[in-house]
Amino acid sequence: MVMNAQTAPTQNGTSQWWPSKYGADDQAGALNEITPAKVLEAVRLVRQGRVYDLAHVLHQDIPAFPGRTFRQYLTTNYHQINRRHPDAGPEGLGSNSVNWIVEQLTATQQMGTHMDGLNHLQMGDRTYNGFLLADIVEDYGTCRLGIDTLPQVVTRGLLIDVAASRGGERLEPGDVITVADAEKALASTGHDVRPGDAVLFHTGWGGLWGADNDRYAVGEPGPGLALAQWLADHRVALTGCDTWSYGPYPAESHCEPFVVPQLLNVRHGVVVVENLRLEEAARNHVHEFLLIISHAKLRRATGAWVAPLAIV
């Protein structure tokens, strides 16, 4: 029996997901769905000129997955060094007494509001497009699928407010957002999901950020596996949530942790953004907008901090 590359079984019994429909060497995944025509469609959504900042402020006390840290150190010794320089003025370098301070960071990009690279999650020893870890992992990152290989994002954004649709302040840990939830919320606003869209989910869980960080980091609601597949079937480019990961935790099946982002990233190349700040946009009933996400091009990294902008 001859099997298609998309359905042939792998060693662990799952069906083969490579080569990607975007090409055997592709590293951009579903961001390929954002065409020039899509960008023009998104730009035409701007009517008011109002900008919503969807990122949280980064600092050392933000909630994070265990083992992940953010430390910022300030370097002020330039002041003393400058005063010893031959061209120093009375209080700094030169007759204008210029001084400066800088900071240094010890941190992972996998905390705070960030975009995951398609090298972040694997299924066994394979990534999106079937690349083997043994072939791509190097000392300072991966030679394929690093965050620097992903294009910057300018597209149509949709905010699906499931908390409002269900009539509460927030969903609870383990709550599963279903296809029916998404369709109901979309119907209430008169919008639909199109290829190349970025679909963001407001669960209300993000309201705990900074107010109860311990509770925020213990669990989360999120899109379920069926909804993730629905998003992939609709050819979305990107999806995100106001939670520390993506998908319900505890998971729908206790033996399949983080299976939702795994499905999106590994099988479909759909990019995920986590820890979004969506309270203000949801409160103001912002459901369709121009979304701009520019990420630092960190060579071979598994993610990057982002400050997404929703513009209406």
Protein language model regions, located:
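Active-/binding-site microenvironments in catalytic and ligand-binding cores
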Residues: M1-V312
